[in-house]
Amino acid sequence: MGGGNPVVAQMWKLVEPVCSAEGMELVFVEFNKESQGRVLRLYLASGVPDRGVTLEDCAGISRQVNGLLDVYLPELDNYTLEVSSAGLERPLAKEIDFERFAGSRVKIRTAAPVSDRKNFTGILLGVSDGNVRLMVDDKTFVIPYGEITRAKLVNEDGVSQ
């Protein structure tokens, strides 16, 4: 998953060690062209159970990442960097996320149809052998991890996942 964007791949390599050193988990990286220009978004989660991501955490990571980008990716100019909490409906970006959040309600979108559909909302059963298992209306779907273009937790009735 990740679409093969080389900037996103470089960002993971540069930013993940910074986040880990600060007790944060890098959850997801986006690099998009939007109406206001190019936007680089980093989504974080706390590496400490029952602790959220604070504004100070985001600001600290932002300062460090800006410095890294200036040194290692100087060709990346004229962009906006946004650093925020992944939130209750956090993206699932790594294969291990699909195991960690087994039992949670999720939304998944695929690149190609799986059983004649591309969008799924159901209970995540886990991942094995490169396949994500999902229960939707009492039916189990097996979705190849490599076909997933977007996945996130679904927050139901204000209850965090």
UniProtKB/Swiss-Prot annotation:
GO BP terms, alphabetized: ribosomal small subunit assembly; translation
Cellular localization per UniProt: Cytoplasm
UniProt keyword Membrane, yes or no: no
UniProt entry tagged with the keyword Cytoplasm: yes
Assigned keywords, A-Z: Cytoplasm, Ribosome biogenesis
Pfam families: DUF150_C, RimP_N
UniProt xrefs under InterPro entries: Ribosome_maturation_RimP (IPR003728), RimP_C (IPR028998), RimP_C_sf (IPR036847), RimP_N (IPR028989), RimP_N_sf (IPR035956)
Subcellular location, principal: cytoplasm
One GO cellular component, as annotated: cytosol
Signal peptide: none
Similarity field: Belongs to the RimP family.
Database matches in HAMAP family: RimP (MF_01077)
Purpose of the protein: Required for maturation of 30S ribosomal subunits.
Name used for this protein in its record: Ribosome maturation factor RimP
Species assigned in the record: Desulfosudis oleivorans (strain DSM 6200 / JCM 39069 / Hxd3) (Desulfococcus oleovorans)
